[in-house]
């Protein structure tokens, strides 16, 4: 049973791809037609693949597997953080630091430092230091929070990574390939499905499109962990996001 309707996908503008001249021929099987120089994505396949992704991730979540959401572009950053937190998953929504997965031992030490500084800040210890020393520690804390806040409770590598915008997150995807971590990725018409485990052909630029797809995946994770999704927790795009 599909977890999304074609009407929902259409309303969110999921079908709008990039300009035809910017396409990746490997996306040909997922393109329905070309209209006014713009590729139109086949939403039947989008619905099928999104359903497949959600079924897989729901089962994985039920089995205790951990998911990392990744989306650092402006349109995706807020959505990624919000939806990951809603389903108690990890996220990266600022710059991807090279080696976040392949050099996890080093990154883990920085995560530990973040937690240490947060504890010192909460206890008031930083406030008791001389102003210059306190300022240095606060700058360090702000920097660590910016890049690592979404993974500060991550104690091991994720089991699945959900990616918004393959072209932007190439480094992260290569790290997943190297480590054998499965990926689910929103793929626009300028991307390659060959390096992704489950591609979801869709508009990766429109806020409503990103919100719909990432939200459905978060719903599946929530369902896998806790049972039926609490509809009151699901947020919808505000008028300013449309």
UniProtKB/Swiss-Prot annotation:
Transmembrane segments: none annotated. Keywords: Chloroplast, Plastid, Ribonucleoprotein, Ribosomal protein. Coiled coil: none annotated. It comes from the Eukaryota. This is Small ribosomal subunit protein uS2c. It holds the Pfam family Ribosomal_S2. CDD domains: RPS2. GO terms for cellular component: chloroplast; small ribosomal subunit. Belongs to the universal ribosomal protein uS2 family. The keyword Chloroplast applies. GO terms for molecular function: structural constituent of ribosome. One of its GO terms (biological process) is translation. Gene3D superfamilies: Glucose-6-phosphate isomerase like protein, domain 1 (3.40.50.10490), Helix hairpin bin (1.10.287.610). The gene is rps2. It is found in: Plastid, Chloroplast. HAMAP family: Ribosomal_uS2_B.
């Amino acid at each position: 049973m599909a977890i999304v309707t074609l009407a929902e996908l259409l309303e969110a503008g999921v079908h709008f791809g990039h300009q035809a001249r910017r396409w990746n021929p490997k996306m040909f099987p997922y393109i329905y037609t070309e209209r006014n120089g713009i590729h139109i994505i086949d939403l039947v396949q989008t619905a099928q693949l999104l359903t497949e992704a959600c079924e897989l991730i729901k089962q994985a979540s039920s089995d205790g597997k951990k998911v990392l959401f990744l989306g650092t572009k402006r349109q995706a950053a807020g959505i990624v953080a919000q939806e990951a937190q809603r389903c108690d998953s990890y996220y990266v929504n600022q710059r991807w630091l090279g080696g976040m997965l392949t050099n996890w031992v080093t990154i883990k030490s920085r995560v530990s430092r973040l937690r240490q500084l947060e504890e010192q800040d909460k206890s008031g210890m930083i406030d008791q230091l001389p102003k210059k020393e306190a300022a240095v520690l606060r700058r360090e804390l702000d920097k660590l929070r910016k890049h690592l806040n979404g993974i500060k409770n991550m104690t091991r590598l994720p089991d699945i990574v959900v990616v918004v915008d393959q072209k932007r997150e190439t480094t992260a995807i290569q790290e997943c390939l190297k480590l054998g971590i499965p990926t689910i990725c929103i793929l626009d018409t300028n991307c390659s499905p060959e390096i992704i485990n489950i591609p979801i052909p869709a508009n990766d630029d429109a806020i409503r499109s990103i919100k719909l797809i990432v939200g459905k995946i978060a719903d599946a994770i929530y369902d896998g962990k806790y049972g039926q999704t609490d509809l009151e927790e699901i947020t919808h795009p505000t008028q300013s996001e449309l």
